[in-house]
Amino acid sequence: MPFCESKCPYCAFGSSDDEFKKVGAYFKALFFDLNFQLKSQNIKEISTIFFGGGTPSAVNAKFYDEIFSILAPLCTPKTEITFEANPNSANLAWLKHIKNLGANRISFGAQSFFEDKLKFLGRIHSREQIFKAVENAHAAGFKNINLDLIYDTKFDTKKRLLAEAENLKSLVITHLSAYSLTLEENTPFAGKKSYKKDSDTLAKFMIEQTQRAGFRQYEISNFGQICKHNLGYWQGKNYLGVGAFSVGFVNGTRYYAKSSIDAYITQPTHREREILSPSELVREHIFLGLRSIVGVEAGRLNEDQKKRANLLVENEKLLFKNGKFYNPNFLLSDEIALFIEG
């Protein structure tokens, strides 16, 4: 959902804060695209759905009614349906509406409980609105609630990160996504090295405090009750991407939708294709498997890669169990992946 009330200076995702007049036309295109994708792939059942953005809560909840008229017949009681939302725009009425449509997981872009850090990150909600949003989510009937936090900014110290983690204890949520600030290209934060601490110590501390708050780490940035949708990405499962800026992956081919709202409205079903080679698929499996509980299947590695992985097992950097290599320290995932890949 590529609409936002304001554009955050660190965000490189495709979105716009000044094209709300196109929402109606966009949803018509989205409906057409979704219908086309489901029929062309002969989808009979959906295991997970994720409404991301952008900011899905920036759009009137009634716009999702027609979308769910297609999705609902393909869902089961076990289907995980997540909506991303911002604390300032996800009011009780909006939350109740999407809950009645079938949503059962809500993800709030909190980013911080400190007002100065929120302002630095370009967020337009307050600390108080985070608590109110979670309260409203419970009132609407949500039992699976995620918060996003950002750390390793110039504002962060151990003392402040401890306070961030302490706030989690006072909220009844099931999941936390904690992301180290990335200075993405083509954003206002690009190249602003002073904006980021780049501290391994802070990253380790944040992970420790999050786990002490009761959220078990299962991926480098994710803690708590496992998000089935994201787990599917790391497992290399097929998924459809629907909407402007979306990306899909089916049987080794990646599909890219149009990367502007206008272009998508004009050609909603158009996709650029990228066919991944066997070695590229293995590379992704290694990198994603080592940064999560998914692990790396020994049977997908060549002999040299297996030797290097076994060397890491001997040196207690990896664990080996039931035909898979597992990484006990996700912060080292990229270095280990590069070593194994060779």
Region annotations inferred by a language model:
Residues 12, 16-39, 47-300:
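C-terminal scaffold of the Radical SAM
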Residues 2-13:
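Local cysteine-cluster metal-coordination motifs and their immediate loop/turn environment
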Residues 329-342:
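Short, amphipathic alpha-helical interaction segments positioned at domain boundaries
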